[in-house]
Every structure is written in structure tokens, then in C-alpha cells.
């Protein structure tokens, strides 16, 4: 296992060193479990009580955390330990690539264009007219349809399916089982008979985008479904046709977005939320978990819906009252009218 000196790590995050700059750590571990060969961090002051007992070889802390540490501790002092942790986790990352080189069982069209140092895993299929940028990694069993373009340094884990004409930017990460560019849910109804509408648009994904396992992003009906730069989408999400997600937005697991929804920049969408289509959500909106969004949101802020978990007996009473809310409202108005007389 590779070792890293405190000096080397400090240079990556612009940290001030307190202690031995030559100490070597091999990886990162939780505060309460790190040993003297490991680096740890504290991102919340409520955990300061654990600093004195920490056995870590080095700690990432803020200036205000120092007084809670042992005098013998080796410290990397920064403004934001969590951001520093994220940067160092990338720097020290030992996750293997999804593929190394081009496997002999991969099927690559003669008309595909491959950049330098492209890797393609076993049984992957690269169809006609595909363009793969430098250092692209295509995992085992992936399908890359006709005329797909994938930018440099993007990695697809095993069994990702990218349909024809999709464009994916650089430095993206797509987890296993994701499907990008499948047909949107477009049909016309002729007296009870469904007529399928061919989805002739595409999907355009920007740079530095991450897409979670088994997430589906449908192609547009006529125009493109668009995911802008620096968007992160968790597992098991459904992004319908012609959705547009703005820069810097984060989408947690299990979210469903209906067609032609426009989500602004720097939004946070909580897990299992369901959002109606053909409307807009403005920039810097937070929707808490299991939110049901039926109308446009025009003001930045935090929005919630749904009933938090209750004991079953309490919930049943609440549900019963909800069914009678119209009757209760009429009785209340009648009482108010009498009192006003």
C-alpha cells in the first residue's frame, strides 16, 4: 500500500502543518477507528470530544479544533476539513479502473474513433461512428450506440447502455446499470389505442457529471434532454424526456422527474421526490426528501411536503381526520358565523 507524507498531503490542500511533516499515512479512516498509519478528519464540532483519544497518524482540523487535540497529534490545519478530506480522498484513491486496455472480446466498429489511452472492457460493444476522447474507460458489457460522443477522462462502469447520438462531456463518471438515451414515454391515444411517438431527440450531458447506478435518462421527443456541467445524480433516478437540469444541481436517490421539467442551477433534490413536468424550478431550491412538487417554484428556498413518520395509531387518526377535513371546515365556519352574530 502506498504511503503519503504529511508534507505531500498538505501541498495538495494548502494546509498548515502542526507536528511531524515527515509522518507517513496510507489511507483515510473514520475518526474513532483510525490507527497510527491512517489519516482522519473532523467535520462537525460535536465530535471534538473524540480528538484527544484519536489514534490516527494525522488529523485534518480547523484552527478552532486544535485546542481539543493532543499536543503530540500531527495536524493538517485547513478552513474546511470536509472539503480537504474530499480532495485527499481523490488524491489517495486506489479504486481500480473499470477496464485496462482493450479486451480481445470487445467489439469495436472500424468507423469508431478512439483517442489516446482508451480502455474497453470485455464484451463491450462500440458501434459505428462513436467518438471516444483520450483516457476514456468503457467497462465490461457496456453498449455504446451509433454516433455517440464521449469526452476525455470519462469512465463508464460495467453494463452501462448509451443509445445512439448521445453526447457526454469530459471527466464524467457513470455507474453500472445506467441507461442513457432510451425512448421517452411518448404516445398519442387514438380512441383507446396507443400510438408510439418515435423519440428523435437525444441526451446531452455536460462535463464533470456523475450518474448513479441504474438511473435512466430518456432521450428527448424532438429536442434534447440536457444535464448541465457539475450535476450529480444518485442511483435509481428517472429523468424523463426533455428534462433540463441546471449546473451544480444534486439529485438524491429514487427521484422521478416528469417530462419537460426545467430544474435551475445549484438545486438540491431530496431522495424519493416526485416532480411534475412541463414547469420550472428556479435556481437554489432545496426540496426535502419525498417531496411531491406539483407546481412551479419561483423563489429560492427550502420546500417540504408529506407527513413524517408517526406511530401507526397516530397516523390512522390523522388519516381519518384528513378524510373529514371538508366536514370539519364547514362546521368551523358555521361556529365562526354564529359567534360573529
UniProtKB/Swiss-Prot annotation:
It catalyses: a UDP-3-O-[(3R)-3-hydroxyacyl]-alpha-D-glucosamine + a (3R)-hydroxyacyl-[ACP] = a UDP-2-N,3-O-bis[(3R)-3-hydroxyacyl]-alpha-D-glucosamine + holo-[ACP] + H(+). Pfam families: Hexapep, LpxD. The keyword Endoplasmic reticulum does not apply. Keywords: Acyltransferase, Lipid A biosynthesis, Lipid biosynthesis, Lipid metabolism, Repeat, Transferase. Pathway: Bacterial outer membrane biogenesis; LPS lipid A biosynthesis. Its EC number is 2.3.1.191. The active site is at 241 (proton acceptor). GO terms for molecular function: N-acyltransferase activity. GO terms for biological process: lipid A biosynthetic process. GO terms for cellular component: membrane. It is an enzyme of class 2 (transferase). InterPro entries: Hexapep, Hexapep_transf_CS, LpxD, Trimer_LpxA-like_sf, UDP_GlcNAc_AcTrfase_non-rep. The keyword Repeat applies. Homotrimer. Belongs to the transferase hexapeptide repeat family. LpxD subfamily. Catalyzes the N-acylation of UDP-3-O-acylglucosamine using 3-hydroxyacyl-ACP as the acyl donor. Is involved in the biosynthesis of lipid A, a phosphorylated glycolipid that anchors the lipopolysaccharide to the outer membrane of the cell. This is UDP-3-O-acylglucosamine N-acyltransferase. It comes from Histophilus somni (strain 129Pt).
Amino acid at each position: 500500500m502506498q504511503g503519503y507524507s504529511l508534507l505531500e498531503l498538505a501541498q495538495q490542500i494548502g494546509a498548515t502543518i502542526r507536528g511531524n511533516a515527515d509522518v507517513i499515512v496510507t489511507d483515510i479512516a473514520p475518526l474513532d477507528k483510525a490507527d497510527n498509519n491512517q489519516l482522519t478528519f473532523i467535520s462537525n464540532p460535536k465530535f471534538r470530544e473524540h480528538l484527544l483519544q484519536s489514534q490516527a497518524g494525522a488529523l485534518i482540523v480547523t484552527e478552532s479544533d486544535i485546542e481539543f487535540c493532543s499536543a503530540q497529534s500531527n495536524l493538517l490545519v485547513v478552513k474546511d476539513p470536509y472539503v480537504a478530506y474530499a480532495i485527499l480522498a481523490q488524491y489517495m484513491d486506489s479504486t481500480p479502473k473499470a477496464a485496462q486496455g482493450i479486451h480481445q472480446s470487445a467489439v469495436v466498429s472500424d468507423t469508431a474513433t478512439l483517442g489516446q489511452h482508451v480502455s474497453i472492457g470485455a464484451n463491450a460493444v462500440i458501434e459505428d461512428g462513436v467518438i471516444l476522447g483520450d483516457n476514456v474507460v468503457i467497462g465490461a458489457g457496456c453498449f455504446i450506440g451509433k454516433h455517440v460522443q464521449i469526452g476525455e477522462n470519462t469512465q463508464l462502469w460495467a453494463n452501462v447502455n448509451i443509445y445512439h447520438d448521445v453526447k457526454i462531456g469530459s471527466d464524467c463518471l457513470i455507474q453500472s446499470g445506467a441507461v442513457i438515451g432510451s425512448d421517452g414515454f411518448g404516445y398519442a391515444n387514438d380512441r383507446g389505442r396507443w400510438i408510439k411517438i418515435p423519440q428523435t431527440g437525444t441526451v446531452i450531458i455536460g462535463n464533470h457529471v456523475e450518474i448513479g447506478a441504474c438511473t435512466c435518462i430518456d432521450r428527448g421527443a424532438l429536442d434534447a434532454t440536457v444535464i448541465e456541467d457539475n450535476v450529480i445524480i444518485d442511483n435509481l433516478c428517472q429523468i424523463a424526456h426533455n428534462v433540463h437540469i441546471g449546473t451544480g444541481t444534486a439529485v438524491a436517490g429514487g427521484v422521478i422527474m416528469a417530462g419537460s421539467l426545467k430544474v435551475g442551477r445549484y438545486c438540491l433534490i431530496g431522495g424519493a421526490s416526485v416532480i411534475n413536468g412541463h414547469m420550472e424550478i428556479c435556481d437554489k431550491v432545496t426540496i426535502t426528501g419525498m417531496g411531491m412538487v406539483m407546481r412551479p417554484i419561483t423563489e429560492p428556498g427550502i420546500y417540504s411536503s408529506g407527513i413524517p413518520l408517526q406511530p401507526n395509531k397516530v397516523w390512522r387518526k390523522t388519516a381519518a381526520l384528513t378524510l373529514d377535513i371538508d366536514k370539519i371546515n364547514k362546521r368551523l365556519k358555521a361556529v365562526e358565523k354564529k359567534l360573529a352574530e
